[in-house]
Amino acid sequence: MKTYNAYDTIHELALEQHGVFTAQQARAVGVKTTALVMMVRRGRVERLAYGLYRDPGAPLSRWTPYVTAVLWPQGMTGVLSHETALDLMELSDANPAKIHLTIPRKHRPRRRKPPPGVVLHFADLDPSDVGSVEGLPVTKAARTIRDVAAANIGPALIRQAIDDARQKGWLEPIDGDALTRELVAAGKL
């Protein structure tokens, strides 16, 4: 008969999410809060932020910082956006120094700071504006390009993003043309 081991349960969960998990997810798989606290004290688990943990036994990957950002907002999932979304979809030469995350307007954390290197944006995203890259929620190309245009990223990068989105199939040609006209009319191109 196999005995229950809280760490093994956490480790399996963390492996599925590039080493990162939330306290809420740990409880959902049967790990008690007291067991999680003991794992932190013993160094088996690292506390990244309030309710957010990393298993040092799980290998880090390119995706670990993104998963950390997405899981950080408790009770909901953030959406990778702006320059981060451009980078993940490989649209333009955007190379953001920070991870951009959009969360709903009503979800404004007062006491909790986001993980280091995460920039928060607040918007109520329509489900049709959210896609996926490597299983991570990411704003779709048209929404992303509108967001970076509103943030004044620069016309050359915006043009390149539109062209790349068309070539890679993230934007239909007719949608790319409409987006270009919209941004020209708004003075962004």
Question: What feature does the model see in each segment?
Answer:
Residues 2-189:
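Short gly/ser-rich loop at a beta-strand->alpha-helix junction or flexible surface loop bordering the NTP-binding
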